């Protein structure tokens, strides 16, 4: 009698486990499908936001009033510094260009933020676009402490951009990587300009 009782309990337990395993597999599939659906919605939303940001950045370049807020700066020796975007930027507005660097390890500096701020008049602005939507924008900047060519590349479909500053009298180019936004939407803090 005990054997029959144990056998019956064992069979019920085994059936229950198989039902649990099947429902667990079904739940896993449903969870994966829901996760894929959420990812697709997230990707579509992100793509829409990137498209809107790209159109705003393109309009700002055409209007000549923009700021590239840099997340990192690449130096000629291969060194990359990750920096604060509101104190490291390249901007253009009202025919005036500004380039500012400021580093987190504050030391005495000309602009009071740990770096330099240079301004100058802008000339020779040119803009072109390739078939992939990448925009190439360049200009000359001439001021008391700067004489350089600035080349900006806006990546197609997003507002990610890079600006390469090539000085006219030295070969020490630096590149700012970050996001290009209209000047009015910029969150920049300007230090004291040189001279």
Residues covered by each model-derived region:
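Bacterial Sec-dependent N-terminal signal peptides
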Residues: 1-27
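Sec-dependent signal peptide cleavage junction
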Residues: 19-60
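N-terminal post-signal-peptidase region of extra-cytosolic proteins
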Residues: 52-53, 70-85
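A short, Trp-centered hydrophobic/proline-enriched beta-strand micro-motif
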Residues: 59-74
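One face of beta-strands
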Residues: 64-66, 90, 95-99, 148-150, ...
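Solvent-exposed coil/turn segments that connect beta secondary-structure elements
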Residues: 71-73, 93-95, 102-104, 142, ...
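Mid-length scaffold segments of soluble, non-membrane domains
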Residues: 80-134
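Helix-rich interaction surfaces within compact, conserved domain-sized segments
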Residues: 124-195
């Amino acid at each position: 009698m005990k054997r029959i009782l144990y056998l019956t309990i064992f069979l019920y337990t085994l059936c229950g486990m198989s039902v649990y395993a099947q429902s667990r597999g079904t739940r896993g599939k449903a969870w994966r499908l829901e996760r894929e659906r959420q990812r697709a919605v997230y990707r579509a939303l992100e793509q829409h936001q990137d498209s809107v940001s790209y159109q705003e950045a393109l309009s700002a370049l055409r209007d000549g009033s923009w700021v590239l807020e840099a997340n990192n700066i690449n130096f000629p020796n291969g060194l990359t510094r990750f920096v604060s975007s509101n104190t490291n930027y390249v901007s253009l507005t009202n025919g005036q260009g500004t380039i500012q660097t400021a580093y987190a390890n504050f030391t005495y500096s000309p602009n009071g933020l740990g770096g330099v701020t240079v301004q100058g008049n802008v000339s020779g602005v040119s803009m072109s676009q390739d078939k992939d939507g990448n925009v190439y924008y360049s200009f000359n900047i001439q001021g008391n402490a700067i004489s350089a060519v600035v080349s900006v590349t806006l990546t197609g479909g997003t507002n990610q951009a890079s600006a390469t500053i090539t000085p006219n009298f030295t070969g020490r180019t630096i590149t700012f990587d970050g996001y290009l936004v209209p000047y009015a939407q910029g969150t920049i803090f300007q230090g004291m300009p040189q001279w």
